[in-house]
Amino acid sequence: EPLDKTKHTYCQAFAIYGLAAYMRAIGESDPDYALARDKAMALFRLIETKCSDAGGYGEAYEPDFTPVGNEKLSDNPKLMERHETASRTMNTLLHVLEGYAELYRAMPDEAVRRAGEVCLERFLNVMYNPGKRRLEVFYDRNYRSLLDMQSFGHDIEASWLIWDAAETLLPESNRAPYLHMCLTLAEAVRERAFTDHGLENEVVEGKVDHTRVWWVQAETVIGFLDGYEK
């Protein structure tokens, strides 16, 4: 019996990513391909019908998809001090986009492509803060940013994941704004967080968190390599 039955949109998206990667690895001739395809598409439809609304994607749900609080993905101490919980997060949208891009690579489907394109547009037009050269992290339901924060790990991760999705889902003629955004994010992270002993974690209300987190360092490797290759 699961101890935690919460349905996180983030988790559904990672399941899509894993199934789609499996599909690409085994190929259409494998007898398991159709099963993986059907499960991935069922999860895609579930996200689009149960985890989405007119403004974007929700975060966490009961097993029957009644919305619940999202403490696990919005557990920043500053938000907790204010008794605030993010209704939307940049991180969830990023991994929904990642899953959809991988699914489209495995099995081109126009509904998947269009849903991914909407995610890309939301990053460019809503979550990206061009004045501060960063992605905002935590939001209320109407996309009001809840915290003056830059997550260096998420920004360098987004710099390559968003571009990967743009190359996969968009015609070349529509990619230029995403290239500019992704290169700007990577450059801002390099300027603000890169040191000779790894990448800083984040900065919140002007205070830098110097903690070295494993996944932040890993995303830094691929993010800067991707920026170099652009």
Where in this protein do the model-derived segments appear?
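Glycan-recognition and catalytic cores of secretory/periplasmic carbohydrate-active enzymes
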Residues: 1-230
